[in-house]
């Protein structure tokens, strides 16, 4: 009796997890307003975008720092 209850419980739990769909927000790029100089390392650009301009992330593209934000 308890084994059947556990089986039903885990079946419901498993089916509930299947219904959860993860969605990723689209990111849009924006040229960093206050980053100065050529961008050589993604780490420094990412740190600048997150901490100084409050964006999601940052990356170097064509020696310029681009910050990403949710569209």
Curated annotation (Swiss-Prot):
Record keyword Disulfide bond present: yes
Domain of life from the UniProt record: Eukaryota
Post-translational modification as stated in the protein's UniProt record: Not glycosylated. Contains 4 disulfide bonds.
Entry annotated with the keyword Signal: yes
InterPro entries: Defensin_plant, Scorpion_toxin-like, Scorpion_toxin-like_sf
GO BP annotation list: defense response to fungus; killing of cells of another organism
Disulphide-bonded residues: 28-71, 39-60, 45-65
UniProtKB keywords: Allergen, Antimicrobial, Defensin, Disulfide bond, Fungicide, Oxidation, Plant defense, Signal
PROSITE patterns for the chain: GAMMA_THIONIN
Signal peptide location: 1-25
SMART domains according to UniProt: Knot1
SUPFAM superfamilies assigned to the protein according to its UniProt record, in alphabetical order: Scorpion toxin-like
Purpose: Probably has antifungal activity.
Subunit structure: May form dimers.
Similarity field: Belongs to the DEFL family.
Protein name in UniProt: Defensin 1
Biological source species: Arachis hypogaea
């Amino acid at each position: 009796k308890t084994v059947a209850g556990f089986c039903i419980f885990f079946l419901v739990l498993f089916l509930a997890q299947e219904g959860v769909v993860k969605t990723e927000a689209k990111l849009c790029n924006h040229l960093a307003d206050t980053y100065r100089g050529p961008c050589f390392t993604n780490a420094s650009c990412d740190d600048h975008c997150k901490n100084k301009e409050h964006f999601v992330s940052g990356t170097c593209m064509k020696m310029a720092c681009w910050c990403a934000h949710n569209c």
